[in-house]
């Protein structure tokens, strides 16, 4: 979407909004989402820019038309979901909230996905371990949730250095794991993850082992 198109769309919808605490011209949640095919996206002009991994994730999420984003802050994931919060406020995510803790996060995002909305969450290291109980059912149910995991050592005592221990856990859950090595991957993988997970999702229609 061009800046001119975005501005025009904002001007056409903001007059209907009256939300206390929001500045004049605030765009409703999700109002700037636009459906575009993969072929059309590939034809758009491209440029090379320098950005952090969290900023790359933000640009990927902006293009993903996310319906629900739920997370609980944990270093170093907090900045990424903060960026998602900005996208919600700008109108690129329909609904966003911070859960009470990690098990609550994974339970809530599972419910959202099972209800049929495009769902995004993120966590890191110890947070993933705390939420593991709730996400264990995702692969068997084939829920198309996209979870961004920022690799961090599983700490005792406290440590925040990078590590791949939680990836080892995820590889044995049955979940599809896309491992990003740079900012370009962190832009590409979330978009690919949504397309792949929704393509292979067979919610409630999987044949039983006897079929």
Language-model region placement:
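Conserved small/polar residues in nucleotide/adenosyl-binding loops
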Residues: 204-211
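Conserved thiamine diphosphate
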Residues: 161-203
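Secondary-structure boundary motif
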Residues: 86-90, 199, 211
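Thiamine diphosphate
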Residues: 2-169, 174
């Amino acid at each position: 979407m061009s800046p001119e198109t975005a501005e025009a769309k904002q001007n056409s919808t903001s007059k209907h909004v009256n939300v206390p605490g929001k500045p004049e011209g605030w765009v409703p949640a999700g109002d700037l989402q636009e459906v575009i095919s993969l072929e059309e996206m590939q034809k758009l002009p491209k440029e090379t820019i320098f950005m952090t991994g969290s900023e790359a994730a933000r640009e990927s999420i902006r293009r993903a038309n996310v319906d629900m984003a739920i997370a609980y802050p944990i270093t170093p994931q907090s900045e990424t979901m903060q960026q998602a919060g900005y996208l919600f406020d700008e109108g690129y995510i329909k609904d966003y909230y911070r859960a009470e803790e990690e098990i609550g996060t994974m339970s809530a995002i599972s419910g959202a996905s099972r209800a049929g909305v495009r769902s995004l969450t993120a966590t890191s290291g110890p947070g993933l371990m705390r939420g593991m109980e709730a996400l264990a059912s995702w692969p068997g149910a084939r829920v198309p949730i996209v979870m961004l995991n920022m690799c961090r050592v599983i700490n005792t005592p406290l440590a925040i250095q990078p590590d791949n221990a939680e990836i080892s856990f995820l590889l044995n859950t049955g979940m599809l794991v896309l491992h990003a090595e740079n900012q370009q991957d962190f832009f590409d993988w979330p978009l690919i993850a949504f397309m792949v997970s929704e393509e292979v999702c067979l919610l409630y229609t999987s044949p039983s082992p006897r079929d």
